[in-house]
Amino acid sequence: MDMRRYYANPGEQPLDCIKPDGGFTAIFRTIACIGDSLSSGEFESLTEDGQRGYHDLFEYSWGQYIARAAGCKVYNFSRGGMTASEYCDSFAASKDFWNPAYASQAYIVALGVNDLMGQNQPLGTVADICPEDCERNAKTFAGYYGKILQKYRAIEEKSRLFLMSMPRDCNDSAEQDGKKAAHAVLLHELANVFPFTHVIDLYRDAPVYDERFHENFFLSGHLNPAGYRFTAELVMTYIDYIIRNHPEDFTQVGFIGTGFHNVSAKW
């Protein structure tokens, strides 16, 4: 038996060894995915007379592909067009997504496209986050994003947080690519502030979404079913890599939400 696939390996990159079954992602029994259309399995329809429609079909979301592959329960806390500010100001409360009944062992946060590209909101910095009171966070993307992390950590103190950056695309302008790069930097800074937090850095490690990728995995401006499945494999593989490279952060995942812990391991 080759045990190398179960350990951290020198020189291995996060997406070198794809895990279609999720690998160690399966250690989480509950995962909540917070995001926009790409977290919602959104498909774009187009009629003969040019009318476009946008449809969130959650069973096709990468989160539900993860649920089926890894055997986890996955919540879709998402909607097409979502921003961190709308999530905090109205959406989450209107959908009861702050309800402790939905407390999860892991949260995957995939926001930023509509905030930074669509609405041109200021990115902000980690200094926009008030550690003592999330209601005092600055009204920047960083401030709202940090508020989401703070509120879910208040619900489940020991949850593991995964922050997802945006993959590069051949159709991005230099300005858009620059915003994606800055967004990724911010996520790494947030991961240094919040304990048990890691970055799924698709900007750095995922393949560039080139013309061939669009032909295979896109339907107009959104992913097609295979594209969402592909994204699920990226996310699961990345989480598996993180767990193998930081086992001390995940030894007690089984105790999250139980009220128990083991003092001999990181908690």
Map each language-model feature to its residues.
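Serine-esterase "nucleophile elbow" of acetyl-processing enzymes
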Residues: 2-78, 97, 192, 248
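Structural recognition of the beta-strand scaffold that forms the well-ordered cores
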Residues: 32-35, 39, 73-78, 105-110, ...
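Conserved SGNH/GDSL esterase-like catalytic core that processes O-acyl groups on lipids
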Residues: 44-139, 143
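A structural motif corresponding to the C-terminal end of an alpha-helix
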Residues: 65-73, 147-162, 186-200, 242
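Active-site segments of SGNH/GDSL-like serine hydrolases
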Residues: 114, 148-182
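Catalytic His-Asp segment of secreted/periplasmic serine-dependent ester chemistry enzymes
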Residues: 166-267
